[in-house]
A protein has these predicted regions:
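Metal-dependent amide/peptide-bond hydrolase catalytic core
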Residues: 1-4, 14, 54, 187-395
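Glycine/serine-rich anion-binding loops at beta->alpha junctions
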Residues: 104-119, 196
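Acidic-glycine-rich active-site phosphate/pyrophosphate-binding loop
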Residues: 87-101, 178-189, 323-324, 357
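Hydrophobic/aromatic beta-strand patches that form the interior of the parallel beta-sheet core
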Residues: 51, 77-79, 141, 165-167, ...
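Beta-strand secondary-structure signal
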Residues: 65, 80, 139, 185-189, ...
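Acidic/histidine-rich catalytic neighborhood of metal-dependent amide-processing enzymes
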Residues: 113-185, 394-395
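Residue-level signal for inorganic ion chemistry
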Residues: 19, 23, 43, 170, ...
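Acidic/His- and Gly-rich active-site-bordering loop/insert found
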Residues: 2-105, 129-134, 363
């Protein structure tokens, strides 16, 4: 019997429709609770062992777990995906009223990443209905808060889960991703001296110092990064995303803060990332007679550093999964990398011994967009792929 004898495409479509319909983001009073409970109840209906686990003492932020082959802290295969989305914002259509057009399902989270969650659920349901005999355990981990600071996966790691293999279903258009950059957000504050705007020579203008730092980043740091790109991922990047300073036009500003996003490679130690920024900040501050403070923006990323991820493309796990992917997509496959973006593989691949790959339905380019959508055919392919992975690695 084929995969779709155990779960139909119509049933898979109903799953993704339900998931999109349930708001699960940081602006919801109960955050991801409703979608976590939906997933848990759907697994319970299939008599699949499942549980909710709160990740935060102050707010209802549950991870939802399910197990085949018995509960284990060291599952042979973990299907990991985040159940939160970004908010609906000003979408081109009602964000949580999904509809289908030209083989695509539209709605917030369709690509990022409820399409992938649907594939995981469908694979687990089909495996249970097929009566597969599990020699090794498999785990579904629907994690919370990835769009903020990955507290769901961080909690999973801190509570002792050590999977052997992990697949993360971020939208890769059903290509198998083996590497991506890490990221760090850094805040630099220039500290000058205020005075009346009519005599600017009596003060130290912190905005000028911050502007000089931005200039140095553009003229020196960015070209330096671009001069030695990674052969697969390209160069590291830096983006100044926030500038905040001053009070009134007639006051020389004594403080100006910039916040920047730095994407870095496995070959770039975090200490080097910091040192580059500190060196330029010191030069800019000195030129304008200012001082400066800097800090990693810890509240904007996991307390575990958002490290780069890379697995050897020739690893047995990668190569065997590529063969399964070719069976499902009916075309030759090669490993790919994400030149931009980040996934929880940066945590699971660095803070555990797990081998991590990223493969899922949808286009990352339309994630968070006002017309977010996901290909239904890719969701069906993902569902079948994850089922085959359960068979191959656990049965």
């Amino acid at each position: 019997m084929s995969f779709f004898d155990y779960i139909s495409k119509d049933e898979i479509t109903a799953l993704i429709t339900d998931l999109i319909s349930i708001e699960s983001h940081k602006d919801q009073p109960l955050f991801e609770s409703a979608v976590a409970e939906y997933i848990q109840n759907r697994f319970k209906k299939e008599e699949i062992e499942t549980e909710l686990e709160q990740t935060c003492p102050d707010f209802p932020r549950p991870n939802v777990y399910a197990y085949l082959g018995g509960k284990s802290k060291s599952p042979e295969l973990m299907l990991n995906g985040h159940i939160d989305t970004v908010p609906g914002f000003n979408m081109d259509y009602p964000a949580y009223t999904p509809f289908i057009r030209d083989g695509k399902i539209y709605g917030r989270g369709s690509a990022d990443m409820k399409g992938g969650i649907t594939g995981f659920m469908a694979a687990f349901i089909a495996a249970k209905r097929a009566g597969l005999v599990f020699r090794k355990s498999a785990m579904f981990a629907g994690v919370t808060g990835e769009e903020e600071c990955s507290q769901g996966t961080e909690h999973l790691i801190k509570t002792g889960y050590e999977p052997v293999k992990v697949v993360i279903s971020e939208p890769t258009e059903m290509s198998l991703c083996t590497a991506h950059k890490g990221f760090e957000w850094v805040e630099v504050t220039m500290i000058g001296r205020s005075c009346h705007g009519s005599k600017p020579w009596a003060g130290k203008n912190a905005i000028y110092a911050a502007a000089r730092l931005c200039d140095l980043i553009q003229k020196e740091l960015i070209p330096e990064l671009e001069s030695h790109p990674d052969p697969l991922l390209g160069p590291g990047t830096v983006c100044v995303g926030v500038v905040n300073g001053g009070h009134d036009p007639n006051i020389v500003p004594d403080r100006c803060t910039i916040q920047l996003d730095r994407r870095f490679m496995v070959t770039e130690p975090l200490e080097t990332v910091y040192a580059q920024i500190i060196s330029l900040a010191q030069r800019a501050a000195d030129e304008y007679g200012c001082k400066f403070e800097w800090r990693p923006m810890d509240h904007s990323r996991p307390s575990m550093i958002a490290l780069p991820h890379a697995i050897d493309p020739n690893d047995d796990y990668v190569q065997s999964t590529l063969k399964l992917l070719e069976e499902v997509t009916h075309k030759e496959q090669e490993p790919v990398v994400w030149p931009c973006g980040w996934t929880d593989a940066g945590l699971l691949g660095n803070y555990t011994k797990a081998k991590c790959i990223v493969v899922g339905p949808g286009e990352v380019a339309c994630a968070h967009n006002n017309d977010e959508y996901c290909s239904l055919e890719q969701i069906y392919q993902a569902s079948e792929l994850y089922f085959k992975m359960l068979q191959t690695y656990c049965c």
